[in-house]
Amino acid sequence: MNQKLRCVLVMTLLGLSPLAEAHSPIKDIGEFYNGLLHPLLVPSHLVSILVLGLLAGQQGLPAMRPAMAGFCLALLLGLAAGVGIDESAAQWLLLMAATGLSVMLAFAIRLPLWLVWIPCMLVGFVLGLDSLPESTGWQRVLLTLLGSWLGAVLMLLCVMIFSEAMTRPWQRVAIRIAGAWIGASALLVLSLALASRTA
């Protein structure tokens, strides 16, 4: 990974850090688009979807189908559950999952097909529980939830396709390096969260 790419990654992470509590809606763009952008604006959601998509794509096309199906179903169940969980608890769960998945990604661990859908369902369900909108009124809530589901699914699909398309040896190495950086970033955020709780 060259120096420019490292700088871009660091600046991106620093830019995302103020958005750690970005569950509040953006004004004047509507409920659907707020939901659509939600996975991009919450760092723990963004990191977990990125590493999940990279890992699933690394496993190859046969693994992507159960991964996508498991994620879509679990995300839908989480959104439909209608019971939010504490934001800090969700952040911890997602970042710990991202850390574990990033280790598998960095070491290019091959997962059996029957095992691929388990981390996808875990991440999808927690994302769904942590994506409950602040809107009132069932129509607004429904639009926000629909946007959240579609945004997360499209983001995961794009990352999976990108990762699966990286077939050259140097590209596979770059994916593994990205996994290591994502894991390091997740650990950094976890460390900061732990430090803030103990301070």
Residue ranges and their predicted role:
Residues 2-10, 17-199:
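Membrane metalloprotein/metal-transporter helix-bundle signature
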